[in-house]
Structures are given as structure tokens and as C-alpha cells.
Amino acid sequence: MIVVASPAVVREIMRRHGISPRKSLGQNFLIDLNIIDKIIKAADLTPADLVVEIGPGLGALTARAAARAGKVLAVEVDRGLLPALAEVLEGAGNVEIIRGDALDVDFDRLAGEKTDGAFGRGGKKYKLLANLPYYLTGPLLLRLLLERFNFALMVVMVQLEVAFRLTASPGTADYGALSVAVQYFTEPKVLFRVPRTVFYPPPGVDSAVVRLALRPAPAVTVRNEDVFFQVVRAAFGFRRKTLLNSLAASGLGPGREAWLEVLKRAGIDPQRRGETLSLSEFASIADSFLDAGGQ
């Protein structure tokens, strides 16, 4: 295997394969082994683990994960990177490279197929590692959570501002629908900040590594999860409006007067704003909406 730990190594690999970093895919390759080893430590990998890595790039993190885990499935969307990735990981017999878009891949099915059913839906939980570009972070995390893929934890690199959103508290500027979804399903923790200088090419912003440990059960109990998230999205749809106006304008439910009654039943002031509500308050609104005949 090739140790990808400097700009010179990245440039040489790309020169040999006639490729260059694609800005449209957010390709900034992590080249600091100290940071990589901290990510591996955070994932607490053992030979019993299956790791699914999303966006392996040139394989710097993949190689380190392969040294600890039983098997690594590296899912890469960029077909042009695959020969370079294969070269870097040559000799790593427990790594399998899969060309695929993380927004489409059925990770549970993939895990099951590659482990004869030992992992994935109906099997053991696996671990996810990812260095996520900004454009992909929200949609992918929501998909992974809402589709209930059978992972035990995720350790992800995200832009620093996104890390703040994942862990934000009600009443703060960073708190939003993504915060609610992540905190509903997982216990998120920002582990450490990552300067832009440890990537090649360096991005325009700093990043952070976040650990998302799946909760044994969601943070709050709701009668209908789909309705809960519909209410959350509606409440954050118009951040400058009051909660009542946001819900009434969302198209969800029969109208303003009905929403006023729903909020009254839930014990929520209609003049509040969505970003001030806790998960339990969103749950109360969703259940009250169902009591009023919503669906």
C-alpha cells in the first residue's frame, strides 16, 4: 500500500493516473496521518467490525481502517479515482472498492451481500466513516438516519459550521431541522477541529470530526414518525415567521385556525419560532396534530 501523507504524494498519484481533484465533488484529500489516526481511534475499530467508508478519495483513511477492522467497503462515486484508489490500496486484502453514489446505495444490502448476511439489515451493525463535502452532508445524513440503515455509529468529517448545526441547542442560530433529525436518532459529539491546511488541495474553510452514536431508541417517543418530521420541516420552513404562521403556510394540515387549536392542545405558544422548540415540544405538536385528525 502507498502511504498518502503529503501533497507531493497526492500530486504524483494523480499525475500517473491523469486525474485532478474535482471541485464539483468537493474533493479535498486528507493527508495528515495524525488526524487520520484520531478518526480511527474515535471509531474504536476491531477485527470484528465491518466498516463502510463513503468517499474514500485516495484511500488514506481507508488504509488505516483496513489495518484495524475485519473488512472495509469503500464506496466512491468518482469513476476516475478508482484506478488510483486501487493502486494505493494494493495488498489490502480486506478492502473492497465499490463504485456508487452514496445517495442511492442500499448500504444494508451491500453489507449483507459482502459478508454473507453477517452484517446489514437482519444482521450485525456496522460502522460508517466519511469525509463529507458540504453539498452532500445534509441530504446524506438525513437519508442514512431516516432510512434506518443498520449502523452502530458514524464518524464523519464535515465543515465546521455543519458540525455546529448537528449539535446545536434550541434557541441558537445553528439549530434547525438537521439538528432535530440527528439528535432524534443519535448522540452527536464534536470530537475535534480540523484545520484546512491538512488537506490537498486545501478547502476554503476548516472542518471538524463528529461522532454520531446511534441511540438504542429515539430521543423522544412519537406516535407517527413521518408526521413528526413533517411538523419539524414545516416549523423551520420560514425561519422569520412565528411558529403558527410557519405551520399555516407550510401546506400541512387544514389551515391557520386548526393549527392554532393544535398548538393550544400541545401547550405551545403560537408566537414562538420553530428554532426555539425542543424535540419533546415537536413531539407534542405532532401528537396533537394527530389528535386533531391530521395525517
Swiss-Prot record:
It catalyses: adenosine(1518)/adenosine(1519) in 16S rRNA + 4 S-adenosyl-L-methionine = N(6)-dimethyladenosine(1518)/N(6)-dimethyladenosine(1519) in 16S rRNA + 4 S-adenosyl-L-homocysteine + 4 H(+). SMART domains: rADc (SM00650). InterPro entries: KsgA/Erm, rRNA_Ade_diMease-like_C, rRNA_Ade_Mease_Trfase_CS, rRNA_Ade_methylase_Trfase_N, rRNA_adenine_dimethylase, SAM-dependent_MTases_sf. It is found in: Cytoplasm. S-adenosyl-L-methionine binds at residues 28, 30, 55, 76, 101, 131. The keyword rRNA processing applies. Transmembrane segments: none annotated. Its EC number is 2.1.1.182. Belongs to the class I-like SAM-binding methyltransferase superfamily. rRNA adenine N(6)-methyltransferase family. RsmA subfamily. Specifically dimethylates two adjacent adenosines (A1518 and A1519) in the loop of a conserved hairpin near the 3'-end of 16S rRNA in the 30S particle. May play a critical role in biogenesis of 30S subunits. This is Ribosomal RNA small subunit methyltransferase A. It comes from Pelotomaculum thermopropionicum (strain DSM 13744 / JCM 10971 / SI). The gene is rsmA.
